[in-house]
Amino acid sequence: MNATPEKADDLIVVGKIFSVHGVRGEVKVYSFTDPIENLLDYPRWTLRHEGKVKQVELVSGRGSQKGLVVKLKGLDDRDEARLLSGYEICIPRSLLPNLAADEYYWYQLVGLKVINQDEQLFGKVDHLLETGANDVMVVKPCAGSLDDRERLLPYTEQCVLAIDLEAGVMRVEWDADF
């Protein structure tokens, strides 16, 4: 492992180390990719936590009940592996596959202003949640918002009418009273 960081703006968080596994330095990882095993397609990761940055290489990985179990190059001790708990797993944005014109990565949606069919500004997308049925956007108020309410909006075709990344706006079909 070395400590040469990528440019922070070029990195995308794709997972998180949450625990250790066994005594040989393996770590348990929660993957934000879909399917979760896609995280194993990236052989080099940048790890970040509380201002610390580390570059690591993936040796192997496999699925487990609560995510993935991963072996990193040069990490052979349980105590050393425990120190990585809480680290975000990042990859360069340039490694993400291209999407169709009407598809978006979550990171592209975060920060968009959310405006409904009545031109009411609800706020900005703060983050998204995976619920099983459909993804849910957490919209928090911002300057100029209709009110101070946090809203949970489904990320579905019925709700999301249009997305304009350049303008930083998402148009939705959603009543202000919901």
Curated annotation (Swiss-Prot):
Domain PRC barrel: start-end pairs: 101-178
Family: Belongs to the RimM family.
Free-text comment about domains: The PRC barrel domain binds ribosomal protein uS19.
Oligomeric and partner information: Binds ribosomal protein uS19.
Biological function: An accessory protein needed during the final step in the assembly of 30S ribosomal subunit, possibly for assembly of the head region. Essential for efficient processing of 16S rRNA. May be needed both before and after RbfA during the maturation of 16S rRNA. It has affinity for free ribosomal 30S subunits but not for 70S ribosomes.
GO CC entries: cytoplasm; ribosome
Localization (cell): Cytoplasm
Protein name: Ribosome maturation factor RimM
Lineage: Bacteria, Pseudomonadati, Pseudomonadota, Gammaproteobacteria, Pseudomonadales
Name of the gene this protein is made from: rimM
Coiled coil: none
Annotated source species: Pseudomonas putida (strain ATCC 47054 / DSM 6125 / CFBP 8728 / NCIMB 11950 / KT2440)
Taxonomic superkingdom: Bacteria
